[in-house]
Amino acid sequence: MPFDLKAFKSDIVFYIDNYERLEDLLNEIDNKMEKIKHFFNGREKVLLKLENLEEKISDIPKIMAKIKEYRIKIKAIITDEYDEKAPTVRKEKDEEKTVIYLKNLRSGQKISHNGNIILVGNVNAGSEINAGGTVVIFGSCNGIVRAGLKNPHSYILTLSINTPLLQISDVKHQLNKQYNNPVFVYQKGGKLMFKEII
């Protein structure tokens, strides 16, 4: 069953396991939510854990939209291993929290946050993102993105890139190539590495 949910500590986690077709997953979400929607009051914010996030990145906006139909908001997307057996969970500091924006960034607009930033929308030319942690963009990136300003192990993940400048920690990179597929950008050996996901 690719879609399931669990209560853990004070959080509800929506788990999405490996799946073949997005349409089948969305139908399963409908079937499951129709059975349990009476448990939710329309104010819940849940965590989303998706297996093979890099491969399925382009599906995230449709998955979030489907869950939103049931008046449930995604407060964070878990991008690493979520250890539900851990005896204690370190309380997240304010500056480490993930913020989610559902908008397009227009020229002249800028968003900054000390933690991670998830943007469901496009970063247009002339706009800018500055994050202390990781930046995930479910859209095209044509503006300047600076990630890892407080955590050098952060990364940038986006559906496409055609931007003049990317930065992770203190490593800057001027692009001379356009990426039309999802791409994972990380720092290694003082350089930015680009892994295109095809």
Curated annotation (Swiss-Prot):
Keywords: Cell cycle, Cell division, Septation. Pfam families: MinC_C (PF03775). GO terms for biological process: cell morphogenesis; division septum assembly; regulation of cell septum assembly. It comes from the Bacteria. SUPFAM superfamilies: Cell-division inhibitor MinC, C-terminal domain, Cell-division inhibitor MinC, N-terminal domain. Cell division inhibitor that blocks the formation of polar Z ring septums. Rapidly oscillates between the poles of the cell to destabilize FtsZ filaments that have formed before they mature into polar Z rings. Prevents FtsZ polymerization. NCBIfam families: PRK13992.1. Interacts with MinD and FtsZ. Belongs to the MinC family. This is Probable septum site-determining protein MinC. The lineage of its organism: Bacteria, Thermotogati, Thermotogota, Thermotogae, Thermotogales.
